[in-house]
Amino acid sequence: AYCSLGGFAFNHPEYIYPEIADVYFKMEGKALGHPLLRRDICVKNDIEIRKSPWFLIITGANMAGKSTYLRTIGVNYLLGCIGAPVCAASLTLYPARMVTSLRTSDSLASNESYFFAELKRLKMIIDRLQQGEQLFIILDEILKGTNSIDKQKGSLALMKQLVANQACGIIATHDLALGELEKEFPNQIKNYRFEADIQDNELTFSYQLREGIAQNMNACFLMKKMGITV
């Protein structure tokens, strides 16, 4: 294991070692990039979580960069926690247990649907929080396996429960209603977005994180571009 960490550091001399915070929770980073993306295409972004509870809600259009941002944060956080250098200009983190819901899958063998598997994952997170465990949570488009009304109601309830349990983390979503939670919890929730811009009938992405709730959606535009009548 030590040889692997040493080899990783040797192969990435431009990476830096993070500073370790001693108070739950803190993660502040500048110019974080995904280690698996080529340098010439890697767009870097910042993160700032200074206290508990605190959640970043990331909204945005399809392909705008939400999931890549979550993976960038998660990979660098894990690298920093195990003693490896990170792809960033600077990073300070508190080494809590990281829990994610990024690639939940169903199971025919266990007779378990995608939705039920996701519920089990979310229940595990709530249980650990209620037991007093310190977690850093990363969620990507939760409750995809149900209808939009049920999904919105469940997502809002989950976010309120996470805040009540002093949780910290990031959630990416297409549901703009979640962004309204910042008004209810201005000291615990912050909105950020990735935008898709349409110029001259072409879709462009900056992949740069911006403050606020997403303004542009692109699903219908992409359907039309693919020749599907909308």
Question: Where in this protein do the model-derived segments appear?
Answer:
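Transmembrane helical bundles of ABC transporter permease domains
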Residues: 3-13
